[in-house]
């Protein structure tokens, strides 16, 4: 399908087939489309509303063009959010990654700088002294030897550069805002994925089913968080064994008291790091929200058989203080690798 035809179709609110979307997105990500065409298509698609088929095709193109990380995928999980919830909480997903690693999971963390919060994964890793710009083979070593590896999105998705200008100038959400969680460079088959809009729950679960994921929990809290909330019930769309089931969970289901989110809000990455460190050793409300999310990730990864068991494993992990040691270990390891690459 030609760009002009695709723009006309989405402007008339016509859904595109997988093949047509794939062709258009490939033109965008290989530099064949003009900025005006990119902007027109993305706006038209957003106003129409993206289907699971269109999202799947767009993600497939990104996967075909990305720089992959080759690693064993057993018990491999990504903990990621779309961003866009505007809550400005500390980085719950990154803290959860270290808890999961200390409990026996393996985390391929795919992230970028902040979208909606004061501290994205990359921002936090910067202040924690964890090197971001490692080549794929060394990211794989981090995952294999420590249990956590961080894949800085711009290093693995260079094809995205063709859409940066139009996206920045438009300043609105487009399909690109939800593609990151669907394009893990290590091919993590399991995920805890937070979304900013409840309408995306089943759409994202269906897209991941089509892309071959094994066990995924897509979550959106009733208070708007793109993760499992400590302050409100959270809706879940769970993909497992090729089937999608929806249900709702709440903190009290796991013996955790509901608490306000205000103490978890941060302004800087340094603020976020303080709360992350508290969460990693089981201190305060930060520990509780991390236990919920890390527990869900342990369940998705197959380390725990149930969500409840996952939360207990996460709490035991925090009590051991090992997650904080994992973070220090990753900082030391990536520093050594980064210095080696500079020689």
Swiss-Prot record:
Cellular component, GO, one term: cytosol
Catalysed reactions, as listed in the record: N-(5-phospho-beta-D-ribosyl)anthranilate + diphosphate = 5-phospho-alpha-D-ribose 1-diphosphate + anthranilate
Keyword Metal-binding found: yes
Entry keywords, A to Z: Amino-acid biosynthesis, Aromatic amino acid biosynthesis, Glycosyltransferase, Magnesium, Metal-binding, Transferase, Tryptophan biosynthesis
Keyword Endoplasmic reticulum: no
Positions bound to Mg(2+) 1: 93, 227
Metabolic or biological pathway: Amino-acid biosynthesis; L-tryptophan biosynthesis; L-tryptophan from chorismate: step 2/5
Enzyme Commission number(s): 2.4.2.18
Cofactor-binding details, from the entry: Binds 2 magnesium ions per monomer.
HAMAP family (alphabetical): TrpD
Record's protein name: Anthranilate phosphoribosyltransferase
Originating organism: Chromohalobacter salexigens (strain ATCC BAA-138 / DSM 3043 / CIP 106854 / NCIMB 13768 / 1H11)
Higher taxonomy: Bacteria, Pseudomonadati, Pseudomonadota, Gammaproteobacteria, Oceanospirillales
């Amino acid at each position: 399908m030609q760009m002009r035809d695709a723009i006309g179709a989405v402007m008339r609110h016509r859904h595109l087939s997988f093949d047509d979307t794939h062709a258009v997105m490939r033109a965008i990500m290989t530099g064949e489309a003009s900025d005006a065409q990119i902007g027109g298509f993305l706006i038209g698609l957003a106003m129409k509303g993206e289907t699971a088929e269109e999202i799947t095709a767009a993600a497939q193109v990104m996967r075909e063009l990305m720089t992959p990380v080759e690693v064993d995928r057993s018990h491999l999980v990504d903990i990621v959010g779309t961003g866009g919830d505007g809550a400005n909480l500390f980085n719950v997903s990154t803290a959860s990654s270290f808890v999961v690693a200390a409990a026996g999971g393996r985390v391929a963390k795919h992230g970028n700088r902040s979208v909606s919060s004061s501290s994205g994964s990359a921002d936090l890793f910067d202040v924690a002294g964890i090197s971001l710009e490692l080549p794929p083979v060394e990211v794989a070593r981090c995952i294999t030897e420590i249990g956590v590896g961080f894949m800085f999105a711009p290093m693995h998705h260079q094809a995205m550069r063709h859409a940066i200008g139009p996206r920045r100038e438009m300043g609105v959400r487009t399909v690109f805002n939800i593609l990151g969680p669907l394009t893990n460079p290590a091919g993590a088959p399991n995920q805890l994925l937070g979304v900013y809009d409840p309408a995306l729950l089943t759409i994202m679960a269906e897209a991941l089913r089509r892309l071959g994921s094994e066990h995924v929990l897509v979550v959106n809290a009733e208070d708007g968080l793109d993760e499992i909330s400590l302050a409100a019930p959270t809706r879940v769309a769970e993909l497992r064994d090729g089937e999608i089931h929806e249900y709702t969970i709440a903190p009290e289901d796991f013996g955790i008291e509901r608490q306000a989110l205000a103490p978890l809000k941060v302004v800087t990455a340094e603020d976020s790091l303080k709360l992350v460190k508290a969460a990693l050793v089981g201190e305060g409300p930060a520990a509780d929200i991390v236990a919920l999310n890390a527990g869900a990730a342990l369940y998705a990864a197959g380390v725990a058989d149930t969500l409840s068991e996952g939360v207990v494993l996460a709490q035991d992990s925090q009590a051991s203080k090992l997650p904080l040691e994992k973070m220090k270990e990753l900082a030391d390891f990536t520093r050594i690798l980064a210095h080696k690459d500079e020689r």
